[in-house]
Amino acid sequence: MSNTATDFVRFALDEGVLRFGSFKVKSGRMSPYFFNAGLFNSGRSVGKLAAFYAQALLDSGLNFDMLFGPAYKGIPLATATAVALAGHPQASGDIPFAYNRKEAKDHGEGGTLVGAPLAGRVVIIDDVITAGTSVRESVEIIRAAGAQPAAVLIAMDRMERAGPDEALSPHSAVQDVAKTYGIPVISIASLADILQLLQDDEQFAAHRDSVLAYREQYGV
């Protein structure tokens, strides 16, 4: 587990974004942990989150030209990460960003895109990948503008097999996205990093077995 991933998992716990217990998740499964990036909802926490996104992106060594935030959750993520990159000593230059509207605007500048023109190698930023719908829409928008999707950058990779229990895919939603679009998915942290923390920190030992069992059943 990298220092960035370790620090991010602890940060998510401190902010109440990552919790342990019993939670019904979007898939309908009962999960022993829950990651809710919507709880990064203050200037300080979003600023720190953006610094983690920026570091994970730079650590990946990816060649990219700009950021794209899919509406709605990706909008503040792309904006804040562009700010974090602008002040990062490893970043080269001022990174532009753009985002889309869900509804086209029929006055002013019009259209569904806001921000810098989509061009070059574009990184899509989101919190997690569940079904891959926002990624698909983003890829279509970027390609339609004549630009190239370069990667998807997310906060947490749940490393979880997609599909209903009776027809589980052998792959996770993240793996499906990478294969379908031929682009890497970069995550700040993953379920493997959460499990490493549970192994290393005795204060979370009570949750270790349930998370391990969940990964055994649904993990990739």
UniProtKB/Swiss-Prot annotation:
GO cellular component, as recorded: cytoplasm
Molecular-function GO terms, alphabetical: magnesium ion binding; orotate phosphoribosyltransferase activity
Residues involved in orotate binding: 34-35, 130, 158
Record-linked SUPFAM superfamilies: PRTase-like (SSF53271)
InterPro entries given in the database record: OPRT, Or_phspho_trans_dom, PRibTrfase_dom, PRTase-like
Keywords: Glycosyltransferase, Magnesium, Pyrimidine biosynthesis, Transferase
UniProt pathway annotation: Pyrimidine metabolism; UMP biosynthesis via de novo pathway; UMP from orotate: step 1/2
Catalytic activity: orotidine 5'-phosphate + diphosphate = orotate + 5-phospho-alpha-D-ribose 1-diphosphate
Record flagged with keyword Glycosyltransferase: yes
Known cofactor(s): Mg(2+)
PROSITE patterns in alphabetical order: PUR_PYR_PR_TRANSFER
Pfam entry (one): Pribosyltran
Positions annotated to bind 5-phospho-alpha-D-ribose 1-diphosphate: 26, 72-73, 101-102, 105, 107, 126-134
Enzyme Commission numbers on file: 2.4.2.10
GO biological process terms, semicolon-separated: 'de novo' pyrimidine nucleobase biosynthetic process; 'de novo' UMP biosynthetic process; pyrimidine ribonucleoside biosynthetic process
UniProt subunit comment: Homodimer.
Primary role: Catalyzes the transfer of a ribosyl phosphate group from 5-phosphoribose 1-diphosphate to orotate, leading to the formation of orotidine monophosphate (OMP).
Stated family: Belongs to the purine/pyrimidine phosphoribosyltransferase family. PyrE subfamily.
Name of this chain's protein: Orotate phosphoribosyltransferase
Lineage: Bacteria, Pseudomonadati, Pseudomonadota, Betaproteobacteria, Burkholderiales
